[in-house]
């Protein structure tokens, strides 16, 4: 065990970590048995649905359709008629969030985060653009087709700056929907549809319009997420797999991408939630023009493979009334952790989350108190980590140097046993191997060298390095955050690939400063590493590459100091 093999092992482990995320971007959750999805023709063909039309509800035996006179229930004669003359929009505001609801169907047509911006500087819209039809909080029937009420013009019964109540009582039926921002900034909703048991509430499909860069990045994901009984699971949209979740034990369920979340926290009256995958056909500006139900992934045709995939949340009520809270916003860890619903678990910091969370807090502090630039905050954070780990690094270096000094003596022992490692029949000579190892261990003992002394300090550092790496890929704070010059978004790749190329050059220089192993195979592996790292980091977020580049530069400086001190001692 020497420093060259250890360095090679560390570099390979980092490469494997990044390559694993590239090849296997999301670990599939434990499969819950589901019923065969309905919603296809007898021949198994996928049904297509116009924009805003929900998909047929899969699962279980089909429920006989209600007669048209029942589906389009008449107005309740005991209540005064409540029908609006024209469509009207109601705006609710809470701090930096702005919700816009239409009285047509009493649906959420816009949810804007003023502090978050698009690439062109506009406030970020979380409701995915569409050409019309079903919006979040729309009403659908047992077959997931829109109820006639979904297109009705609801009267506005009451309103104030943070809440509104819509009511409809007319030829299309009777319903009441109330929306309000609560003290935590969540949008609460209460929906009542009296006299019928065939309705559900639909939310989605998906969340916000992803950019082309986000769709092409392996670091970006879109999925459904839920907490059932304290276990948080995700289901990637690419799997196109339907799930049905019981209400018992369900803390939240939602749709997410890497940075934003739309989640429902059940209140009262929820019977079950269906995660229905759909394919999206889009038009100008990414607006959804049509969505197509996906009974199962194997029914997606070759022509449909290129279509975007999302989840539609279908909330089934137990009776007339369904009440819930909903979170619409960024997956900002500190914001989510302050809420009592466990939504902070949707921020995926990986295996070393216990280390990544304080690192994120430190990054916030540096940004808020020192530099006000997340790029420079990453640089300073990397310097601080390097300083904190300096005692371990020094201990590792001293131990490795002692091992290097012993290399000639160890090689002499190996040379003496070189011709004795096999017997006359060509079989391994275990006795000779045992004696050689005993002599080497005796040499370690006599020289006061611990063969693991150089390895253990570096292994202690790895969780910190991995956690910082994972934190940078999950931090929404880096989205649209500039650094300097041409780097305008630390969450996306360098458009000119300057950072990854410079990073690979520093990797090469770092290896040149480290004594190369005598083994030609190891030497070739070391020579390949800068090219492997370049390949892995070309499409990586520039914030992540900046961290790695800074770490390489600091390591080069550190190695240069060690080499200089060694030369002075040998002089």
Each model region followed by its residue ranges:
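Selective for proline/serine-rich intrinsically disordered segments
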Residues: 48, 52-66, 75-78, 134, ...
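Short secondary-structure boundary micro-motifs
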Residues: 6, 73-76, 82-85, 94, ...
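Juxtamembrane extramembrane loops of integral membrane proteins
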Residues: 22, 26-122, 126, 130, ...
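A generic alpha-helix propensity feature with a strong bias for hydrophobic helices
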Residues: 28-32, 36, 53, 57-71, ...
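Helix-loop-helix
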Residues: 1-39, 101, 189-192, 212-218, ...
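Soluble non-transmembrane domains of integral membrane proteins
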Residues: 89-346
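Generic detector of short, locally flexible boundary/turn motifs and exposed helical patches
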Residues: 61-68, 74-77, 153-158, 167-168, ...
């Amino acid at each position: 065990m020497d420093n060259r093999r250890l360095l090679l092992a560390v570099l390979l482990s980092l490469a494997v970590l990044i390559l694993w995320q590239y090849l296997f971007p999301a670990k599939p959750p434990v499969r819950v048995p589901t019923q065969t999805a309905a919603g296809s023709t007898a021949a198994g063909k996928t049904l297509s649905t116009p924009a805003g039309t929900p998909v047929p509800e899969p699962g279980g035996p089909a429920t006989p359709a209600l007669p048209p006179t029942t589906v389009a229930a008449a107005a309740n004669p005991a209540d005064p008629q409540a029908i609006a003359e024209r469509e009207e929009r109601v705006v609710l505001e809470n701090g930096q969030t702005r919700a816009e609801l239409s009285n047509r169907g009493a649906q959420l047509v816009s949810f804007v985060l003023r502090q978050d911006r698009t690439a062109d500087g506009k406030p970020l819209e979380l409701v995915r653009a569409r050409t019309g039809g079903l919006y979040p909080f729309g009403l659908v029937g047992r077959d997931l087709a829109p109820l006639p009420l979904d297109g009705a013009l609801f009267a506005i019964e009451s309103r104030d700056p943070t809440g509104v109540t819509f009511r409809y009582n007319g030829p299309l039926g009777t319903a009441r929907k109330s929306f309000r921002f609560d003290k935590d900034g969540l949008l609460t909703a209460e929906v009542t549809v009296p006299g019928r048991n065939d309705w559900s509430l639909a939310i989605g499909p998906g969340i916000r319009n992803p950019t082309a860069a986000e769709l092409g990045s392996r670091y970006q994901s879109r999925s459904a997420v839920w907490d059932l009984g304290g276990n948080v699971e995700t289901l990637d949209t690419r799997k196109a797999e339907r799930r049905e979740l019981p209400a018992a034990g369900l803390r939240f369920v939602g749709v997410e991408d890497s940075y934003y979340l739309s989640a429902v926290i059940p209140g009262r009256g929820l019977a079950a939630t269906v995660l229905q995958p759909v394919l999206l056909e889009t038009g100008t500006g990414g607006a959804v023009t049509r969505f197509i139900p996906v009974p199962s992934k194997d029914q997606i045709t070759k022509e449909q493979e290129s279509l975007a995939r999302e989840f539609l949340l279908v909330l089934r009520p137990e009776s007339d009334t369904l009440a819930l809270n909903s979170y619409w916003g960024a997956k900002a860890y500190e914001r989510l952790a302050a809420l009592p619903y466990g939504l902070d678990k949707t921020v995926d910091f990986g295996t070393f989350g216990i280390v990544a969370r304080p690192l994120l807090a430190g990054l916030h502090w540096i940004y808020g108190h020192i530099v006000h630039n997340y790029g420079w905050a990453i640089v300073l954070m990397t310097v601080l980590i390097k300083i904190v780990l300096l005692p371990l690094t020094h201990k590792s270096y001293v131990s490795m140097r002692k091992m290097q000094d012993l290399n000639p003596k160890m090689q002499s022992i190996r040379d003496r046993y070189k011709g004795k490692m096999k017997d006359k029949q060509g079989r391994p000579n275990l006795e000779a191997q045992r004696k050689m190892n005993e002599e080497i261990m005796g040499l370690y003992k006599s020289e006061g060298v611990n063969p693991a002394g150089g390895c253990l300090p570096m292994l202690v550092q790895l969780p910190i390095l991995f956690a910082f790496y994972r934190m940078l890929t999950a931090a929404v704070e880096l989205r649209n955050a500039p650094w300097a010059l041409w780097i305008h978004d630390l969450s996306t790749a360098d458009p000119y690939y300057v950072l990854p190329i410079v990073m690979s050059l520093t990797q090469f220089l770092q290896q040149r400063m480290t004594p190369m192993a005598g083994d030609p195979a190891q030497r070739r592996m070391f020579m390949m590493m800068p090219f492997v790292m370049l390949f892995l980091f070309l499409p990586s977020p520039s914030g992540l590459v900046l961290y790695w580049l800074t770490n390489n530069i600091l390591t080069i400086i550190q190695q240069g100091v060690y080499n200089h001190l060694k030369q002075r001692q040998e002089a």
